[in-house]
Design a protein with these regions (language model features):
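SAM-dependent transferase fold signal centered on methyltransferase-like domains
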Residues: 1-183
Length: 183
């Protein structure tokens, strides 16, 4: 089990455990591929720590933890989990877009910002490898679920629904935005 410091100044959302669980399941299902993984907005580092501890040993070629403001906390959590000597680890403290632009590319990129992922999509798509996986999380659910219709239209070029289908439609709007940027 992964450990995380209780004295974090960075955002850690325990409710997103299912999201992290799904990432691990997905990556473990990929056959015979040693992957380069990137976490441009690593936050507390918990997702990457779980990757190192829970993915099959031959899955990770290297894993890049990046976060402009919390690399100190990522290092603390890596040490807490006794992973500081892992040669697959790469740490950096750059703006997420700069981190992506300066890289050579990755097989898996996880974009998990606070709010909309839009400002990171262009560079993530540029740096994802052929047949790579781009994981995108959006926490601006008020826009995507229709509470703030004008924000959704402005950010995602789509009109959300405010009914029993709002969450399904919100996911579809986000997927379509990623498709538009990647096209």
């Amino acid at each position: 089990k992964s450990k995380i410091s209780k004295e974090l100044e960075v955002f850690y959302n325990p409710i997103m455990k299912l999201n992290r669980d799904t990432s691990i399941l997905l990556l473990n299902l990929i056959k015979d591929k040693e992957m380069q993984l990137a976490l441009p907005l690593a936050g507390s580092g918990i997702r990457g720590i779980r990757f190192l501890k829970e993915l099959k040993k031959n899955k990770i070629k290297n894993i890049s933890f990046n976060d402009y403001g919390s690399i100190k906390h990522i290092k603390q959590n890596i040490k807490l989990n006794e992973l500081e000597k892992d040669s697959k680890l790469k740490l950096s403290s750059k703006d997420a877009n700069l981190f992506l632009l300066e890289s050579k590319g990755f097989d898996y990129i996880d974009i998990d910002p606070f709010g909309s992922p839009n400002q990171f999509l262009d560079n993530a798509i540029i740096r994802i490898s052929r047949n790579g996986i781009l994981a995108v999380t959006a926490t601006d659910t008020s826009a995507l679920s229709g509470s703030h219709e004008s924000a959704c239209i402005r950010k995602y070029y789509a009109k959300p629904l405010r009914n029993e289908l709002m969450h399904e439609v919100g996911i579809r709007i986000l997927i379509r935005k990623v498709q538009l940027i990647g096209a």
